[in-house]
Regions:
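Conserved redox-cofactor binding core of oxidoreductases
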Residues: 59-72, 82-89, 106, 118-263, ...
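A glycine-rich dinucleotide-binding beta-alpha-beta segment and adjacent secondary-structure elements
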Residues: 203-208, 227-231, 262, 267-272, ...
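Residue-level detector of alpha-helix initiation sites
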Residues: 12, 16-17, 182, 304, ...
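A short, basic/flexible loop-to-alpha-helix module at the beginning of a structural domain
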Residues: 1-7
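N-terminal Rossmann-like FAD-binding beta1-loop-alpha1 element of flavoenzymes
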Residues: 8-35
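Glycine-rich loop(s) and the adjacent beta-strand/alpha-helix scaffold that form part
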Residues: 25-28, 32-34, 39-55, 255, ...
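Conserved N-terminal glycine-rich FAD pyrophosphate-binding loop of Rossmann-like flavoproteins
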Residues: 40-63, 93-95, 99-105
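FAD cofactor-binding and catalytic pocket of flavoenzymes
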Residues: 76-122, 129-131, 138-142, 325-452, ...
């Protein structure tokens, strides 16, 4: 028999970026908030010995235990899905702070085109992709989202500079970035020169890695980045990379109205008479069940888990690819990476770096170029970054290099700091056969069905990937002093084995119409107005940018909706 705990104003499932933002804003407004986190407590002090590439970079010390909960995967609706038991394609964060601890800090706003992609694409190109692609407007515009982007970027102390194509895209800013860009480097200047000679308009990556000492509007301090090269897959021991642990969570804690209960795995959302009443969870140390009543429930865990909890709790209609009916699980999207590596006799100090130390361009991103003769929509940014080459994970070798023995070692040593990659990150558009559902066979450690991922790259993806890959090769060839280039392979079937990105989106999409979305534009569930679902699952597609800035902006907008609902008790749609 589950023990019933004292009721709270708001309970969040998860204590990462979204849960932390919700907690900070609601506790400042006087509400009592409890976050249920299935991992353990951690803080900046836990990362003093984080420079262990084997433990964290290779064996994923900050990530979810796939033996207890994971997803199953198949390529198409007729296939057999099997469990994802070792982290590969994407890395699911664990513990307080979630993926916001091990991210790199790339902090891009989505384009105005992204939020109205169905309408704007149809106006310019008609039904170019056909009916199998389920493009959908988000129900908000860039203008609606801009104030929330501004808030998140000031929370993170973003270091950046204006995008030279911002005016063309209609991507205005109400204020400049809080800090100047990170240091420029010899390597990045080499890329910038080649990109400009290719008629690309370059700018520095917006980085949630602090250029200098910074105090955000909530009074939380960020230290200057040390360019130590241990950002992605690692926590920041300097407190220079913005994360929930050094921004929103301590702010929420300072109010005295916020509690985090760790080792608490939520298994069900409870409901009665059209409302949710709280959640059921298991203490993972004792396996004892508890019921946490709440006036408002906020799903703020990773997008896979948010979708799974709605499904196992029978809230919303499961998407059916055969009929096209239902919205829960619909429009799962990912991203594509492509690129070309250039090799030099000249050395670059690539052993130093930062998570978002880079230069990029948007000339072939979004709808910034004419797609009339192309077999795809949207695009990708073309960039180069100096994250820091680490000895185990970094092994750049030119074509034809030995792959074994003394000559292999010699080639590894020589090329370690003599390579520059020109990369691309491509948008992912929704397809009717890419979706999330519950697996009928496999269960997690608590007896609940695993979430099933049905996904493969599409003809749209392959055409975009080839186009951008060729563009990266053109830029790489133009770099001064280049000796040879190695162009990446064109896209094949999706594989969950090699790492690609932790930019999973969709499944709990937002919109202005309940027939095409799970939540409204304040992320309030259509079927239960005291339930809010926030995260990258709200995206109707994925852009050519990283998702975190948009996730943070949506979380700030969601908190406004929660406060409005708390006062009125009514739907916000």
């Amino acid at each position: 028999m589950a023990e019933v705990l004292k009721k709270v104003d708001v309970v969040t499932v998860g204590a990462g970026w979204t849960g932390g933002i919700v907690a900070a804003e609601l506790t400042k407004a006087g509400l009592n908030v409890l976050s249920l986190e299935r991992g353990h407590m951690q803080s900046t002090e836990n990362f003093n010995y984080i420079h262990d590439e084997w433990r964290y970079g290779i064996n994923y010390g900050l990530m979810q235990d796939c033996s207890k909960d994971t997803v199953t995967f198949r390529h198409d609706p007729s296939g057999l899905a099997l469990p994802y038991r070792k982290m590969g394609s994407f890395l699911l964060g664990n513990n307080v702070g979630g993926a916001g601890v091990h991210w790199n800090g790339w902090t891009f706003r989505f384009m105005p085109y992204d939020f109205e992609i169905q309408t704007l694409s149809k106006q310019r190109y008609g039904n170019k992709l056909g009916n199998d692609y389920t493009l959908q407007d988000w129900g908000v515009t860039y203008k609606d989202m801009e104030p929330y982007y501004d808030r998140f970027e000031k929370t993170c102390g973003v270091s950046g500079e204006p995008n030279p194509l911002a005016e063309k895209m209609g991507a205005f800013r109400s204020s400049p970035y809080p800090q100047e860009p990170l240091e420029n480097t010899k390597m990045l200047k080499r890329f910038e020169s080649a990109a400009k000679s290719s008629n690309l308009h370059t700018y520095r990556l917006p980085a949630s890695n602090s250029k200098g000492g910074y105090t955000n509007p909530d009074g939380q301090d960020l230290a200057p980045c040390q360019y130590c090269a241990y950002c992605e897959r690692f926590g920041c021991e300097y407190g220079a990379k913005a994360s929930p642990l050094n921004t929103v969570i301590p702010k929420a804690m300072s109010t005295g109205k916020y509690t985090i209960r760790t080792y608490s795995n939520v298994t069900q959302i409870l409901k009665k008479d059209g409302k949710v009443t709280g959640v059921k969870f298991v203490d993972t140390r004792t396996m004892k069940e508890y019921i946490q009543p709440a006036d408002i429930v906020v799903l703020a865990s990773y997008m896979f888990n948010n979708a799974k909890l709605l499904m196992v709790s029978n809230i919303g209609e499961q998407y059916d690819p055969k009929t096209g009916k239902g919205t829960l699980g619909r429009n799962y999207c990912y991203q594509m990476n492509m690129g070309t590596t250039a090799f030099f006799d000249e050395q670059f100090n690539t052993f130093m770096g930062s998570g978002a130390l880079g230069t990029t361009s948007d000339d072939f991103n979004g709808d910034n170029f004419d797609h009339s003769k192309e077999k795809f929509l949207h695009g990708a940014m073309i960039y180069s970054v100096q994250l820091g080459t680490r000895p185990i994970q970094s092994a750049p070798l030119p074509a034809g290099a030995p792959t074994w023995g003394a000559e292999f070692k010699k080639a590894l040593n020589y090329n370690f700091t003599r390579a520059i990659t020109v990369g691309g990150q491509g948008a992912s558009l929704p397809h009717k056969n890419n979706y999330l559902s519950l697996d009928p066979t496999y269960k997690d450690a608590f007896g609940m069905p695993l979430l099933r991922l049905t996904y493969n790259f599409t003809d749209q993806d392959r055409a975009l990937h080839k186009f951008i890959t060729d563009k990266t090769a053109e830029v790489a060839k133009r770099m001064q002093g280049v000796k040879s280039i190695k162009k990446g392979a064109y896209l094949k079937d999706y594989s969950v084995v090699p790492y690609q990105s932790t930019h999973n989106t969709g499944g709990t999409t937002m919109g202005a119409d309940r027939e095409t979305s799970v939540v409204n534009t304040y992320l309030q569930h259509w079927d239960a107005d005291n339930l809010f679902v926030v995260g990258a699952g709200n995206f109707q597609h994925n852009s050519g940018y990283n998702p975190t800035d948009t996730v943070g902006a949506l979380a700030y907008r969601c908190t406004e909706g929660i406060l409005k609902y708390h006062k009125s008790g009514k739907s916000l749609a």
